[in-house]
Amino acid sequence: GSYVNLYPELLAAYEAGQAPKPNIHGNTRCQNIVRYEMFKKLGYFVTESSEHFAEYTPWFIKPGREDLIERYKVPLDEYPKRCVEQLANWHKELEEYKNASRIDIKPSREYASTIMNAIWTGEPSVIYGNVRNDGLIDNLPQGCCVEVACLVDANGIQPTKVGTLPSHLAALMQTNINVQT
């Protein structure tokens, strides 16, 4: 395959107000502005959701700074809303299952079934897992929890070595690693 760096296009779209685009397939309450703002500042696209990233850093949620919440569209009440919606959906599904003559089992987006299938059958799969940093990321503390690509097969979960992260990203991550010790 070939490699195309889409960062310049993503940044230009954000600065022109064309990104992030509304999530028509998912939750429209979460606009991912924090994710793009951090991409602009850090030079790397953040894979964490805007809701979580706003919680993990001191820049977007501050006492007396409701203007930041509004500007970056941080959905402070998102998780309680999701819980209410999920509970209602589970009750609806329960009734459907109780009355169904047949139930079709489909894989979910959760990793548990993927991991179990890969270990049990030996069919390889790649997940992004939280594992102990045993030489995986050089400039983060050994023993801390890190999220890396992992190969899963009959041999179990095998994390991928990342190497050294850009120093400003490692420093930002360290602020959240500090609570692990």
Region annotations inferred by a language model:
Residues 1-181:
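Long, compositionally biased stretches enriched for glycine and/or charged residues
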